[in-house]
């Protein structure tokens, strides 16, 4: 089973995935899954849902995301959720 096939098979029953979970279920190597996921993300089929240290969580892209109508910039999303940025937005983020 190729990495892409393993990902598609796993996403048939789950909403999101990380490479170690798919590898444990399907028997494919983590490397092949990571490479396939990166290729599929560049093609617009997958979207990065989040990161925990080095583990990347992916999900299928919605139609709007595939058409480019929705931004999925993970760095800015994580930055806005940080405690420091919340303090900055509390002061400067509100129009008066």
Swiss-Prot record:
It comes from the Viruses. This is Protein ren. It comes from Escherichia phage lambda. The gene is ren.
């Amino acid at each position: 089973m190729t990495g892409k096939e393993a990902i598609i098979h796993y996403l048939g029953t789950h909403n999101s995935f990380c490479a170690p979970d798919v590898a444990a279920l399907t028997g494919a190597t983590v490397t092949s899954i990571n490479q396939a996921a990166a290729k599929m993300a560049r093609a617009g089929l997958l979207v990065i849902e989040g990161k925990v240290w080095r583990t990347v969580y992916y999900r299928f892209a919605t139609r709007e995301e595939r058409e480019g109508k929705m931004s999925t910039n993970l760095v800015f999303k994580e930055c806005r959720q940080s405690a420091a940025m919340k303090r900055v937005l509390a002061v400067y983020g509100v129009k008066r």
